[in-house]
Design a protein with these regions (language model features):
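Active-site catalytic motif of lipid deacylating hydrolases and related acyltransferases
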Residues: 2-60
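Conserved alpha/beta-hydrolase "acid-adjacent" motif
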Residues: 16-17, 141-147, 170
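Short glycine-rich catalytic loops that host catalytic nucleophiles or stabilize transition states
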Residues: 33-36, 160-166
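Active-site nucleophile loop of the alpha/beta-hydrolase fold
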Residues: 35-38, 91-100
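Catalytic histidine-centered segment of alpha/beta-hydrolase-like enzymes
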Residues: 41-42, 165-175
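Conserved alpha/beta-hydrolase fold motif
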Residues: 66-67, 90
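Gly/Ala-rich beta-loop-alpha elbow adjacent to hydrolase catalytic centers
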Residues: 67-77
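Short beta-strand/loop motif that positions the catalytic acidic residue
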Residues: 128-129, 133-136, 140, 148
Length: 183
């Protein structure tokens, strides 16, 4: 029986495409929430509560594997903030950890509760995950490596900043990462 994995893709992402498709190719049963369709229509707080409920119902164990990408990681981190320490392994790729903007593209984003993660973590109120790896590109203006690194330090997560990479980490890098992380 294949091992199950919980996956949250980035904004507008599907669990059956991209990384989700690669996880299926590797023999995993992929569960999670797509950030499109009915789930996207839910109130933000309900989205976060739904993810927390999913984790508690089916993935609250030491051998659980959870992967989240970009905005999906933001939803996951907020869901985990309302729970006790997650017992499984977490892999975050280019996570959004708060607001961001880019002067060159004149694009910015302020997610709901943009400061909550840092506020909880800096006060020691964020439940420290048992195992959390974070990977972000050095040129990622959405995840902002300095912000990711600062948050990771507060929650005892291992962070890797991939030199020269942007928000979409190279497929070869992610494939190699999965080779070691999924063991």
């Amino acid at each position: 029986m294949p091992q199950s994995i919980y996956f949250l893709p980035g904004h507008g992402g599907r669990i059956s495409n991209g990384l989700g498709q690669e996880l299926v190719r590797r023999g995993f049963d992929v569960f999670g929430r797509e950030t499109v369709g009915e789930f996207k229509k839910l109130d933000f707080d309900v989205q976060v509560e739904t993810i927390a409920a999913d984790l508690k119902a089916s993935f609250w164990r030491e051998d659980a594997l959870v992967i989240a990408n970009s905005y999906g990681a933001y939803l996951l981190l907020l869901a985990l903030s309302s729970l006790i320490t997650f017992p499984g392994k977490i892999l975050l790729l280019s996570p959004i950890v708060g607001e961001f903007s880019n002067d060159q593209t004149r694009i910015g984003f302020i997610p709901p509760y943009a400061k909550r993660l840092f506020e909880l973590a800096s006060k020691g109120l964020y439940p420290i995950p048992n195992s959390c790896q974070i990977h972000v590109g050095s040129q990622d203006w959405q995840s902002i490596p300095d912000n990711v690194t600062a948050f990771a330090a507060l929650v005892n997560a291992q962070v890797t900043v991939l030199e020269g990479a942007g928000h979409n980490l190279p497929k070869e890098y992610v494939a190699s990462l999965l080779d070691t992380w999924l063991i």
